[in-house]
């Protein structure tokens, strides 16, 4: 079982007198910066000119270029998309790191897969809230918190663990609990969850169910409701109380169908396929492929995205959602 740390375990905040640079001011960046500031930390924001720069300024932060922020800071938290981090790190952060500084991440991908190679004289750790930035900020403001993970990759000063816990405490995570892990474990489990279950697994399952009903002659609108729309109702029940809460809340007919039919859909062969996905994450195959795809301009990424957006389930869904004004996407769908 994971070791969990709480507020009572952070007896000395070793970062309170340090300057923290938050690199990026998106979902996580704004939450980290504001929570740390509210907890008395000296925070600056590092950005390139644009809307985020203006927003951080409006929120009362001193905003600098990434290089300037890194040069001023003792602690540099990189909250940029994975694929942008290596270039920004090499060009703007690495030249400004000093011995004893802390290089911090919210995801271990680039360090674990050697895309970012920190010098030996800095501490390297991650603090990863297990929720989106808006929730990290809102729960903090309400006096609560989102749990987080932390891991130490490199302890140059001898107090990297204390620094990581102080940072986690600064964003409020110790109120809920901070679980200790490693860069390897955080990275590999995060990627596996996305690919086999949360994104890849779920979308494939939803499309397969939709196609099965439509191919059997059922109206696509009903197939959409049964295989996609109602998924939120079930996931919310699991989110709130696990599988047992979902099974308790649905009808007995639905629960019996779960028991007798679920294992026929997700079979031992499915688990073997999941094992193959995990193996490709562990040996770096997935990372190498994604890095190469990004460097090539993402031709397969964009082609697949365009094709998927034309699937019948998407066409039907767009029409049905016009009937439900209470269903609104949190973000505007567009080209990445």
Curated annotation (Swiss-Prot):
GO terms for biological process: isoleucine biosynthetic process; L-valine biosynthetic process. GO terms for molecular function: ketol-acid reductoisomerase activity; magnesium ion binding; NADP binding. Transmembrane segments: none annotated. Mg(2+) 2 binds at residues 190, 226, 230. Substrate binds at residue 251. One of its GO terms (cellular component) is cytosol. Belongs to the ketol-acid reductoisomerase family. This is Ketol-acid reductoisomerase (NADP(+)) 1. It comes from Bacillus cereus (strain ATCC 14579 / DSM 31 / CCUG 7414 / JCM 2152 / NBRC 15305 / NCIMB 9373 / NCTC 2599 / NRRL B-3711).
């Amino acid at each position: 079982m994971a070791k969990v740390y709480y507020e009572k375990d952070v007896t000395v905040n070793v970062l309170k007198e340090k300057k923290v640079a938050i690199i990026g001011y998106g979902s996580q960046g704004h939450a980290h910066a504001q929570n740390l500031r509210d907890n008395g930390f000296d925070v600056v924001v590092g950005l390139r000119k644009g809307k985020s720069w203006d927003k951080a300024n409006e929120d009362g932060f001193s905003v600098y270029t990434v290089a300037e922020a890194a040069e001023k800071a003792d602690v540099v938290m990189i909250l940029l998309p994975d694929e942008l981090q290596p270039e920004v790190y090499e060009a703007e952060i690495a030249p400004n790191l000093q011995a004893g500084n802390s290089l911090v991440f919210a995801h271990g991908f680039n360090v674990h897969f050697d895309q970012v190679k920190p010098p030996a004289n800095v501490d390297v750790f991650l603090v990863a809230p297990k929720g989106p930035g808006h929730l990290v900020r809102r729960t903090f403001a309400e006096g609560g918190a989102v749990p987080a993970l932390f891991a130490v990759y490199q302890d140059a000063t001898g107090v990297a663990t204390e620094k990581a816990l102080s940072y986690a405490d600064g964003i409020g995570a110790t109120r809920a609990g901070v679980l200790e892990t490693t860069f390897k474990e955080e990275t590999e489990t995060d990627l596996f969850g996305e690919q086999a279950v949360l994104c890849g697994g779920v979308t494939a399952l939803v499309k397969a169910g939709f196609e099965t009903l439509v191919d059997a002659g059922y109206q696509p609108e009903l197939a959409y409701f049964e295989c996609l729309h109602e998924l939120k109702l079930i996931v919310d029940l699991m989110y709130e109380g696990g599988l047992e809460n979902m099974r308790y809340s649905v009808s007995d007919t639905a629960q019996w169908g779960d028991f007798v039919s679920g294992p026929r859909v997700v079979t031992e062969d499915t688990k073997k396929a999941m094992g193959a996905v995990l193996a490709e994450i562990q040996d770096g195959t997935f990372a190498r492929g994604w890095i190469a795809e990004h460097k090539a301009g993402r031709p397969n990424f964009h082609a697949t995205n365009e094709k998927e957006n034309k699937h019948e389930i998407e066409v039907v869904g767009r029409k049905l959602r016009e009937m439900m004004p209470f269903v609104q996407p949190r973000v505007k769908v567009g080209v990445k």
